[in-house]
A protein has these predicted regions:
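Gly/Ala-rich phosphate-binding loop of Rossmann-like dinucleotide-binding domains
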Residues: 96
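Glycine-rich SAM-binding Motif I of class I
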Residues: 89-93
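Conserved class I S-adenosyl-L-methionine
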Residues: 78-87
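S-adenosyl-L-methionine
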Residues: 1-76, 108-145
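C-terminal substrate-binding/active-site "lid" region of AdoMet-derived donor-dependent transferases
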Residues: 154-225
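Conserved SAM-binding motif I beta-strand of class I
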Residues: 101-107
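A short SAM/SAH-binding and catalytic strip from SAM-dependent methyltransferases
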Residues: 143-156
């Protein structure tokens, strides 16, 4: 299973591979992407893995399809949205183009990030960053919805975001399930104890989701009690 990249040497390796790999474009229809095991069984597996490294460096961990972006835009229409830990800001930029009022917040500006540091992800492009700092400091605020995509593994960030939200705010989470390589156990326990899941919205986002090989990420939507 792919784990979050934390070691500086691994970040450097990904950035090197990303320089020569062809681009895997995000935002295409779901039918354009191989997914999961199909990817691993492809005769172009080596090329696809190299493309994934470039994708990590330029976009992030989540393979966003056109259908998922459409579903998010529909779900978020007319809402005030905070993306907590926006990374490259690619998703926030696309949603902003769709008229969504979204604020992209991240404590790392990857345009100026120290690559010798073990903090953060191997991202080298930033499409949108509205707030450079800890997104938790912006909560609860006047936001209707908080978007949390691939929060850092085995850190308290995801849990802190969920705890800082107020009753009635909606969380849209994308990442692996409990025991996977996003967030920590306390975050998932807090979701169970403090949020009401929204099954229909979760299914709508997940039905056209595509995954990288070895990754079991998915969408989850819930409202804080």
């Amino acid at each position: 299973m792919f784990e979050m990249i934390a070691e500086a040497t691994e970040i450097s390796d990904i950035l090197e591979a990303a320089k020569v790999a062809p681009l895997l474009a995000p935002g295409l229809p779901a039918s354009e992407y191989l997914s999961g095991e199909l990817w691993e069984c492809s005769h172009q597996a080596d090329l696809l893995f190299a493309q994934r490294k470039r994708f990590l460096a330029e976009i992030g961990f989540c393979l966003l399809t056109a259908e998922v972006i459409d579903a998010l835009a529909t779900l978020l229409a007319g809402k005030e949205v905070l993306e907590a830990g926006s990374g490259s800001g690619w998703l926030a930029a696309r949603l902003g183009e769709r008229g969504i009022n979204i604020l992209a917040a991240d404590w790392t500006d990857y345009r100026t990030a120290d690559r010798s540091s073990k903090r953060g992800y191997p991202i080298r492009e930033v499409f949108r960053l509205d707030y450079h700092g800890n997104a938790v400091d912006l909560l609860p605020g006047d936001y209707d919805t908080v978007l949390l995509v691939w929060p850092n593994y085995e850190t308290q960030f995801a849990g802190n975001v969920a705890c800082a939200m107020r009753s009635g705010q909606t969380l849209i989470y994308e990442g692996e399930s409990e025991g996977g390589c996003t967030a920590d156990q306390e975050f998932f326990q807090y979701l169970r104890n403090s949020f009401n899941p929204s099954l229909s919205e979760t299914v709508e986002l997940d039905k056209n989701h595509r995954r990288f090989p070895g990754v079991d990420d998915k969408w989850w939507v819930g409202t804080k009690r």
